[in-house]
Curated annotation (Swiss-Prot):
<dbReference type="GO" id="GO:0005789">
    <property type="term" value="C:endoplasmic reticulum membrane"/>
</dbReference>
<dbReference type="GO" id="GO:0034626">
    <property type="term" value="P:fatty acid elongation, polyunsaturated fatty acid"/>
</dbReference>
<dbReference type="GO" id="GO:0043651">
    <property type="term" value="P:linoleic acid metabolic process"/>
</dbReference>
<dbReference type="GO" id="GO:0097447">
    <property type="term" value="C:dendritic tree"/>
</dbReference>
<dbReference type="GO" id="GO:1901570">
    <property type="term" value="P:fatty acid derivative biosynthetic process"/>
</dbReference>
<dbReference type="GO" id="GO:0030425">
    <property type="term" value="C:dendrite"/>
</dbReference>
<dbReference type="GO" id="GO:0043025">
    <property type="term" value="C:neuronal cell body"/>
</dbReference>
<feature type="transmembrane region" description="Helical">
    <location>
        <begin position="64"/>
        <end position="84"/>
    </location>
</feature>
<protein>
    <recommendedName>
        <fullName>Very long chain fatty acid elongase 5</fullName>
        <ecNumber>2.3.1.199</ecNumber>
    </recommendedName>
</protein>
<feature type="transmembrane region" description="Helical">
    <location>
        <begin position="227"/>
        <end position="247"/>
    </location>
</feature>
<dbReference type="GO" id="GO:0019367">
    <property type="term" value="P:fatty acid elongation, saturated fatty acid"/>
</dbReference>
<keyword id="KW-0808">Transferase</keyword>
<comment type="pathway">
    <text>Lipid metabolism; polyunsaturated fatty acid biosynthesis.</text>
</comment>
<keyword id="KW-0472">Membrane</keyword>
<feature type="transmembrane region" description="Helical">
    <location>
        <begin position="205"/>
        <end position="225"/>
    </location>
</feature>
<keyword id="KW-0443">Lipid metabolism</keyword>
<feature type="compositionally biased region" description="Polar residues">
    <location>
        <begin position="279"/>
        <end position="289"/>
    </location>
</feature>
Length: 299
């Protein structure tokens, strides 16, 4: 295993250059194998988990879900605050920021971004809860792609570009996750569900986040600094892939659902009644079908 790890390190160095020594010895960062193994285990659970649960009753997980979502909401809020203050204190340049130009503020950003990397490992639990609760329809290609790739990408980011221009996408994503995990936490409380009308706006916020990240990353291409250009091009490509997948998800989830509701609404009016609007069917059975003829008494 050590020989394999040494070979990987040699390959990475030849392809990406020397690692950033400021993160040497940090948990999970010296060796890529643990991150890779965690990702493989995640994909195996995604594949085998629904098969295991197929003939079993779903778990509620309500209590632990509330704690989990609260924990990630607070962690995301902490990361957002620390990144914003670190960028402000270091006087980061929006257009392009190198990885060794802000002294102690860079170290603050690095420490927070390590938590951001580690949070991507914690977020594997999103999928595991879907499996345990048998919400398999939520385990989409987008969901698995996003979760499986982010942990691996951020291992490389933390080893080669752990601060500087890397901060922007993580800052926006932390803010979006404050909203998202707050929503998930509240949705696990049945009495709160009727008031949670803003789910689609979280998806819109995610799309805006990706577009803004592309814009800010592109600034580093046109107004370059010491931040490596290769990383900027990679991030632009990755953001484009997420925009494509999230846009498809948004269309499938909201636009088609809205069109289906309008169609059902129109059909209901044509039949003289409104049958299915906003996902709810008419709670009153038709009089024609519900009134049964009385049997004649034999006495």
């Amino acid at each position: 295993m050590e020989h394999f790890d040494a070979s990987l390190s040699t390959y990475f160095k030849a392809f990406l250059g020397p690692r950033d020594t400021r993160v040497k010895g940090w948990f999970l960062l010296d060796n890529y194998i643990p991150t890779f193994v965690c990702s493989v285990i995640y994909l195996l659970i995604v594949w085998l988990g629904p098969k295991y649960m197929k003939n079993r009753q779903p778990f509620s997980c309500r209590g632990i879900l509330q704690l989990y979502n609260l924990g990630l909401t607070l962690l995301s809020l902490y990361m957002f605050y620390e990144l914003v203050t670190g960028v402000w204190e270091g006087k980061y340049n929006f257009f392009c920021q190198g990885t060794r130009s802000a002294g102690e503020s860079d170290m603050k950003i690095i420490r927070v971004l390590w938590w951001y990397y580690f949070s991507k490992l914690i977020e594997f639990m999103d999928t595991f809860f879907f499996i345990l609760r048998k919400n398999n329809h939520q385990i989409t290609v987008l969901h698995v792609y996003h979760h499986a790739t982010m942990l691996n990408i951020w291992w490389f980011v933390m080893n080669w570009v752990p601060c500087g221009h890397s901060y922007f996408g993580a800052t926006l994503n932390s803010f979006i996750h404050v909203l998202m995990y707050s929503y998930y936490g509240l949705s696990s409380i049945p009495s709160m569900r009727p008031y949670l009308w803003w789910k689609k706006y979280i998806t819109q916020g995610q799309l805006v986040q990706f577009v803004l990240t592309i814009i800010q990353t592109t600034c580093g291409v046109f107004w370059p600094c010491s931040f490596p250009l290769g990383w900027l091009f990679f991030q632009i490509g990755y953001m484009i892939s997420l925009i494509a997948l999230f846009t498809n998800f948004y269309i499938q989830t909201y636009n088609k659902k809205g069109a289906s509701r309008r169609k059902d609404h129109l059909k209901g009016h044509q039949n003289g009644s409104v049958a299915a609007v906003n996902g709810h069917t008419n709670s009153f059975p038709s009089l024609e079908n519900s009134v049964k003829p009385r049997k004649q008494r034999k006495d």
